[in-house]
Amino acid sequence: MGLRKAKSIKHGGKSLEEILQAHDTFFRGKEGGVRADLTGADMSNADLSGRNFNGAILREANLSGSDLRKSKLAVADLSGAKLHKADLRNCDLTESILPGADLSEAQASGIEFFRCDLSNVNFQGAQLRNVNFRLANISGAKFTGADLGVAILRETDLTGVDLSGVDLSTTLLPKGVTAAALSKRA
């Protein structure tokens, strides 16, 4: 069974396609546009690749198993969103809000998490190669079993972060922090 198309997904009596068209109009500052509020929307197992969700409200949305490759999610509110096994490769999530989101087993390589709120996010088993976490809040995040190869954690506070079972040998860590010191803490 393939992924669902945006036009077949309904939220608040409208198709997701209509909502995203109005959001794109809003984002470009044109008359008649409306910011997308997809709070609690079920967009699981959907093809949403390359879509513009910049500044959208996606609180508690279910995006599990969805294809979001190359989507624009900068400054989006994904608080508590379900992104389990979602494909987020090469998305821009700069300055997005994701506290309590579930990104377990997500394919999230190449993401910009620059200045994001990732507090208490579940990254267990996620693919996070070449990810930028600079200046992100990752307090309380769980990375157990995640792949953080060549990830950037510079200028990131690692207080309360669970990095157990994570190979940090190629991860760029904050100044003065070593992989050995972090593994002793786990």
What feature does the model see in each segment?
Residues 1-2:
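Long, contiguous interaction/recruitment modules in multidomain scaffold/adaptor proteins
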